Design a protein with these regions (language model features):
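AAA+ P-loop NTPase catalytic core and its hallmark functional loops
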Residues: 1-167
Length: 167
């Protein structure tokens, strides 16, 4: 079995043009303060209020790559962290979007996190505390998040009861 590492072009995740965003309060300064210490962010708001646009705007403003994942009930932990794939040369590891973000120092935006299953969201826990690590159990690797990595999650207020699963 051969295992090859992925080479990632960080520029593909950077937002080239400024996304339109109209500030409605202190959210820009609050986000920047949280980013300065790489504090994970949780953004709550109704559908269509601009949560995703806000995160895109902040990634652009900070000049950081952004990897967005639209969460859903069929998403597995492997969809987030990665999996082994077979090809003509054997087996290779393919990083998932969360792993890629942690490796390259991107902002990882998990949109509608409460749509994901509890057994999927549990993988984010060590990235949200002082450890800032991501265990890749299938690969036997523990990734220390890049110093620029930040996790941002969002949800709609109607799904608040589901937050019990990610607390």
């Amino acid at each position: 079995m051969s295992v090859t590492e992925n080479v990632v072009d960080i520029e593909q995740y950077k937002i080239a043009t400024e996304p339109y965003y109209e500030s409605v309060g202190e959210e820009l300064a609050l986000y920047e303060s949280a980013y300065d210490v790489r504090m994970p962010m949780m953004i709550k708001g109704p559908t269509g209020c601009g949560k995703s646009r806000f995160v895109e705007h902040m990634a652009w403003k900070l000049g950081k790559p952004l990897i967005t994942v639209a969460c859903n009930e069929d998403m597995t932990a492997s969809d987030l962290v990665g999996r082994f794939l077979l090809d003509k040369d054997g087996t290779k590891w393919q990083d998932g979007p969360l792993t890629t973000a942690a490796r390259i120092g991107a902002i990882c935006y998990l949109d509608e996190i409460v749509e994901a299953r509890q057994d999927t969201t549990v993988v984010i826990h060590p990235l949200t505390d002082h450890r800032r690590t991501l265990p890749l159990d299938k690969k036997g690797e523990l990734i220390a998040a890049h110093p620029d990595f930040q996790l941002v999650i969002s949800y709609n207020p109607g799904y608040q009861l589901s937050l019990i699963h990610i607390s």
